[in-house]
Regions:
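Sequence-structural signature of mature extracellular/luminal beta-sheet repeat domains
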Residues: 5-384
């Protein structure tokens, strides 16, 4: 391990996180059923179901999720003693996530795309057992284009949804972004969020499917079609492959099938491409947004319904009332074979909205650097 990294490790203070990202208040996490930990009011409480941590260990993975309302990137893993590890850092309006192996993590945020790289050599660990240290190595300034989902193409280059401009985009070395594709119903690029294009699924390293809240071509026209105007569109053919959805998000291509969240109805399901039909697999007791797949499992992000017009009057309201449950914030693990929720994690307090969820394969206990403390000044590694 490089000497500079050794020096940093000696100064790392185990288990210390704060609401603003500084390492000066201890947040005492966590047991397999996590205990509440103190933060500035209102507090944050994370509770995992009994086998959640065991599932992480069995699948040999960790999880990352973004909470754009509070501007937090959370990393969940397993401590050596079998307890849940929770790590967080602050990035304003953090949104979409994309992963490449165990080394690279991409994230969209308020006006930048961030590429994180793991600074720990293979087999090394920071004090406390962290086996991965994601360092924000590259920041790409896009301006506030309301970037949502981000994904990586076959060359490992990012493709993202520029929601404000209703298009798919790539980074530019000289401009805010380079437009790649826009839906056939959008007549021109304009900073008008015409259809609330938000989700992106890749297939064979290419953009394959997107979700939009409507097929409108006027300034914020989607707001009038939140209940049933949502669509899934094939990027290659420009054909709509599913209609009648309520604020769909997070399309994902997995094992030869297209999965999507029908967020406004609280449904997770797949799209029958031959029939052009959405088929629900599981009910989500919250506004579902953020989806990542591994093997026979889906990890889904849940948000409580915001107290504004955008999230009011949706089919989800009726479904929750019919089932006599309140909306939840957290994560669900769904078995794709049965549609059953097999594990869960609930979040209460200051965090009420999640945007994206990513699986970190081969990572046991992840950590990251942010910009609110001087840790990033002391983390120096040399390329060999």
């Amino acid at each position: 391990m490089p000497n500079a990294l050794k020096r940093f490790n000696a100064e790392w203070r185990e288990g210390e996180m704060t609401n603003d990202g500084r390492a000066d208040e201890k947040l005492d996490l966590l047991s397999p059923i996590a205990q509440p930990f103190a933060m500035s009011t209102p507090q944050l409480e994370i509770n995992a179901s009994r086998q959640f941590v065991s599932w992480l260990r069995e699948q040999r993975l960790s999880l990352a999720f973004t909470t754009y309302q509070t501007g937090k990137l959370f990393l969940l893993g397993c401590k050596p003693d079998g307890k849940l590890s929770v790590f967080e850092r602050t990035f304003e309006r953090c949104m979409g996530l994309a992963v490449s192996g165990t080394q690279t993590l991409w994230m969209s945020s308020l006006y930048q795309l961030w590429r994180f790289e793991n600074a720990l050599p293979a087999g090394a660990a920071a004090p406390g057992g962290y086996d991965t240290l994601y360092v924000p190595q590259l920041g790409i300034t896009t301006g506030d284009v309301d970037a949502h989902d981000i994904a990586l193409d076959s060359d490992g280059k990012p493709v993202f949804v520029a929601t404000l401009f209703s298009c798919l985009a790539a980074p530019s070395e000289t401009h805010s972004f380079r437009p790649l594709w826009r839906p056939p119903w959008v007549s021109r690029l304009a900073a008008e969020d015409r259809c609330h294009l938000n989700g992106l699924a890749m297939r064979d390293g290419k953009p394959a499917f997107v979700t939009a809240v409507s097929t409108t071509d006027v300034h914020e026209g989607w707001r009038e079609h939140r209940r049933d105007g949502g669509v899934v569109c094939d990027v290659q053919s420009n054909e709509i492959v599913a209609r009648g959805l309520s604020m769909p998000h997070s399309p994902r291509w997995h094992n030869g099938q297209l999965y999507v969240l029908n967020s406004g109805a609280g449904e997770f399901g797949r799209v029958d491409l031959a029939a052009g039909k959405f088929e629900p697999l599981a009910f989500c007791p919250g506004y579902a947004r953020g989806l990542s797949m591994v093997g026979d499992f889906a990890v889904i992000g849940l948000s409580t319904c915001r107290e504004n017009r955008t999230f009011s009057g949706l089919p989800l309201d009726d479904a929750l009332a019919a089932k006599n449950v309140a909306p939840r914030c957290g994560l669900l693990v769904v078995d794709l074979r049965t549609g059953d929720v097999v594990h869960s994690l609930t979040i209460e307090g200051i965090v009420r909205e999640l945007y994206d969820v990513a699986i970190l394969p081969g990572v046991a206990m992840p950590s990251a650097l942010g910009f609110k403390s001087d840790e990033i000044r002391r983390t120096i590694t040399l390329e060999e």
